[in-house]
């Protein structure tokens, strides 16, 4: 049976494990390659090979369920088919993969597995050769009878095909040209049988056994076609296709596959997908859509692009947590302890979370609230959201919205677009795997807007408790219930949030911290965290509270603690260098005992390496200056108030409260008012309003020196330092009046006074916002007297008691009260006019 011209495969073959089907000798099959080992085989062997030998690979059927593929190599089937890779096509959609066109050559047996990585290689034993069958007829006897029966059945099958006469004739010539010994493999590959049955044919090494395995398959195919033909005679209007012809490569001509309507249970996993759909516990509307898509999927050939799109859609649908949820932990005492351990202060936020837990205990069907934490950077808005999730025992997912300017990021893309995908909300639910997580919508005030739509408008449905129970993502196109999701948004300011979106959220202000709170936070959380991050222990580094307070006051100026943590990290790095150098010295070779005393000092001095430091290293103000350099901020308030025409105001920014200097000077001119400092329209109007009020009350406060007009022959220049920063708002009105009154009267404003408040033309002081942040900024600057509008008295309750005790608050209802409080000894007045009360 040997042949000089027969194919001789190498004794060592790389193995391609496939679950797409069973490759038989003499047939051609397309194989999709996407696993790591198979991808590496294609890249290293097929794409880089230059000889015919490099294109011969061993194809091993993988009997393992593809769903359970893992990094481990599955147990190999003992019999495989050596194949010639005649075509390799790569693609990146929907994921990176290769499609191989492989022609089966002969069987082989795996003798020994030589290696598993990067792809398996085995020592193989060749079992048969396709060319050997061309040298003679099969032996007489039972084998000859089997081969003749098989040939006659194959001819009968071809004659039953519902095709044109030329095609049938061509198939008949193909059967006649093939050696009868090759018919079992070729016909078993052509007809639609299960992988298990094809595997039995592959395992039949003996030719007689092979005929016995393949003949029943061919007979069953013929009986099925006879039944279908009878059915068509009874129902002539039935235009269903009895079978279809698929072109493909085959030896020696072309291969034809007979495709029945019944799907292959092993090779096609749509049945598995259907079971997943039914087990996903979807709502009725979603289930109807999925079943409809499944029916379409079964009718599609896998080569259609829409097949992959539909399959990806169904896989997304079954992976969503339609009915999976976590059980909330409603223990209020445990929640209070956990929140207190995670975050210091933030009493308002903790109170709101505990209220939610209490109501959930009384009403289990309570919808999740929509909270919005508004405050300066670094105060812990994002981290408190994570703590809330831990408190409730829920999954946590953060969605960064800063810079998002496409509404498709929220609502997803429609499936008609190439590369369509769900929005961030649905993707987040898929990631956490439950339908009641805590979603943190970070930086919601920094949403953009573009030609692709407004994402803030897309959030209106998501954040509306009356609508989000039927949120419809464009990709899914079916409603999804978001009512059990706890949404928490964070923002630095509400000014840039659209009013309609802001109205849907419960806004909780998160103000900045006092110095005492920062010290406590540093020693409870920041210092232990930085010690752990830098590999240090409390026995190696200690930062006293006085040093922490010095870092806060002289090296940071912020409402939060982010910059404080960076400075503590810088201290830890400097100490880590000392500790590492000391360990290096201590590990160096120790001198002998007789030379230890005279050599120790000289070694350290000569090498220039410091001796191991004494533990613990305590950071005092001297060490702090060596590490962080000279102080970045100094309390310069008293130095800048040495001339008339300077006053201190209080401003609110998204970064927290700030003190703001206002400077004024006068010169000869034509009564003009000049404003500098990059001011907004509202602040410019406040300056003109202050000038008008002072001009109308110049005689009352003895400011005109006998002239008819306060500004006669005089120009006034009003400047707000930090000119690179845009400034606007009405709260600087009282500061401008005080500054101009100081300039025109020649009297100094008290150096420990700061003020805020809006003014009217009648001299009333109206309330403003951001009182707590402004007061904390004044406290950081060591100011002692704070002038605020009388109607802001209620806001003083939010200020910590220790801060209130350090400050003297003046509640002013009129500008007369402001001027009397801003100057030592009060501000002189010619008459005692009655107080005007605001009824606005």
Curated annotation (Swiss-Prot):
Region (Disordered): 583-606
Binding site for ATP: 375-382
Location of the Lon proteolytic domain: 641-825
Keyword annotations from UniProtKB, A to Z: ATP-binding, Hydrolase, Nucleotide-binding, Peroxisome, Protease, Serine protease
Top EC category: hydrolase
Molecular function, one GO term: ATP-dependent peptidase activity
UniProt-listed SMART domains: AAA, LON
Gene Ontology BP, a term: protein processing
Superkingdom in the source lineage: Eukaryota
Catalysis: reaction(s): Hydrolysis of proteins in presence of ATP
InterPro entries: AAA+_ATPase, ATPase_AAA_core, Lon_bac/euk-typ, Lon_lid, Lon_proteolytic, Lon_Prtase, Lon_prtase_N, Lon_prtase_N_sf
Gene Ontology terms: cellular component: peroxisomal matrix
Domain Lon N-terminal: from-to ranges: 13-222
UniProt motif Microbody targeting signal: location: 838-840
Annotated active site: 731, 774
The enzyme's E.C. designation: 3.4.21.53
Signal peptide coordinates: none
PANTHER family named among the record's database cross-references: ATP DEPENDENT LON PROTEASE FAMILY MEMBER
Known role: ATP-dependent serine protease that mediates the selective degradation of misfolded and unassembled polypeptides in the peroxisomal matrix. Necessary for type 2 peroxisome targeting signal (PTS2)-containing protein processing and facilitates peroxisome matrix protein import.
Cited NCBIfam families: lon
Family affiliation: Belongs to the peptidase S16 family.
Protein's UniProt name: Lon protease homolog 2, peroxisomal
Organism, scientific name: Danio rerio
